[in-house]
Amino acid sequence: MPTTETKTGAGFKAGVKDYRLTYYTPDYQVKETDILAAFRMTPQPGVPPEECGAAVAAESSTGTWTTVWTDGLTSLDRYKGRCYDLEPVPGEENQYIAYIAYPIDLFEEGSVTNLFTSIVGNVFGFKALRALRLEDLRIPPAYVKTFQGPPHGIQAERDRLNKYGRGLLGCTIKPKLGLSAKNYGRAVYECLRGGLDFTKDDENVNSQPFMRWRDRFLFVSEAIYKAQAETGEIKGHYLNATAPDCEEMYKRAECAKDFGVPIIMHDYLTGGFTANTSLATYCRDNGLLLHIHRAMHAVIDRQRNHGIHFRVLAKALRLSGGDHLHSGTVVGKLEGEREVTLGFVDLMRDDYIEKDRSRGIYFTQDWCSLPGTMPVASGGIHVWHMPALVEIFGDDACLQFGGGTLGHPWGNAPGAAANRVALEACTQARNEGRDLAREGGDVIRQACQWSPELAAACEVWKEIKFEFETIDTL
């Protein structure tokens, strides 16, 4: 057989790359179609930030650790990611924000899975980096338009429910695990007849031995119809369709559709973006609203220096599809700094959001009329929090009181009634021009005169506070 002679130096030179030579381009002019990322980097001691930024750009696009001869078979200049800016993080030693631009052609259209696999799939284990956090993404209009987004959106949900001019009220049924399907349905009925708009499966309620999913769907549907008949209002329950596989997930969604309920639920991080996008498509085609729980998010977003900020996860969900998304409360038991939370709440609801670093928004985002996702505030909230919640979130939010409903001393229905009275009192006071930040306590106390249920709730929870310093601040 003939032998092939390889001439070194003919066209390419083998060896380990200095990423800065190719992927650090401070003179680059960002294109309107580029996907932009802001990474918080903590380099290892002695590693220049330019090298780290270039390495992140390389590994999340066309690069590898060494020169390869196949580089000459394509246009690296067209397809490579570029670290185009670096800035030190104020008040932090050896931390930098690296801005990276990715050509749109690197990503499959309409695929959050591919977007995340490329940008965060492999770079977080780099030895040159002590820590890395994706703070924000700019999704360009050209890429946004390849997604269908939420199945219906905020306005379509209000039209379907015939509920306007106030926030929506929800409640997670407790105990989250251990109830039989029939007792679970009883709890749902009591909450809905008392005045709530929704009740909810907890994120880990799927199909366990004590309560199989079909039994739960049946008893909950019966509770919904009974409460609707008594109150004259449209009611719903977030039936969790999260399942071991997509075929089973579709089966549960179809059962909910057959029962005629308005909304189902999915755990989008544990279930995965591919499954979530598929379920959103099913809901859009079959007239179901889709509530999204963010179970597992804190594993990814809690640490200030490493992981992915929740604003990125929220943007990804809006692309993938969800009509509701848990967003934190600012005032309850779960993590959430006010300005940062308001920043990603706007990214979920609004169509055009300007860059505002004071709220953690690194890039201007244009959603091109993609439907909005309604934020869900839940976690350790009760009637005394209502003025702050109405003032912070406004009307286009779902306020979810689990223990704050079921913990009422008189039972579920009085607990629901207390929350409904508090919400309507605060909404009316705001509409009359009162300052809920200063007068909220007075508004609640005045409403207690007309609602013994609210008065009892106020007495029970008057001393309850969750006073811990937030970890994730600007």
Curated annotation (Swiss-Prot):
Its main location: plastid. The modification N6,N6,N6-trimethyllysine is found at K13. The active site is at K174, H293. Its cofactor is Mg(2+). Pfam families: RuBisCO_large, RuBisCO_large_N. The modification N6-carboxylysine is found at K200. Keywords: Acetylation, Calvin cycle, Carbon dioxide fixation, Chloroplast, Disulfide bond, Lyase, Magnesium, Metal-binding, Methylation, Monooxygenase, Oxidoreductase, Photorespiration, Photosynthesis, Plastid. The modification N-acetylproline is found at P2. Binds 1 Mg(2+) ion per subunit. The disulfide bond which can form in the large chain dimeric partners within the hexadecamer appears to be associated with oxidative stress and protein turnover. It is found in: Plastid, Chloroplast. Substrate binds at N122, T172, K176, R294, H326, S378. RuBisCO catalyzes two reactions: the carboxylation of D-ribulose 1,5-bisphosphate, the primary event in carbon dioxide fixation, as well as the oxidative fragmentation of the pentose substrate in the photorespiration process. Both reactions occur simultaneously and in competition at the same active site. This is Ribulose bisphosphate carboxylase large chain. It comes from Oltmannsiellopsis viridis (Marine flagellate). The lineage of its organism: Eukaryota, Viridiplantae, Chlorophyta, Ulvophyceae, Oltmannsiellopsidales.
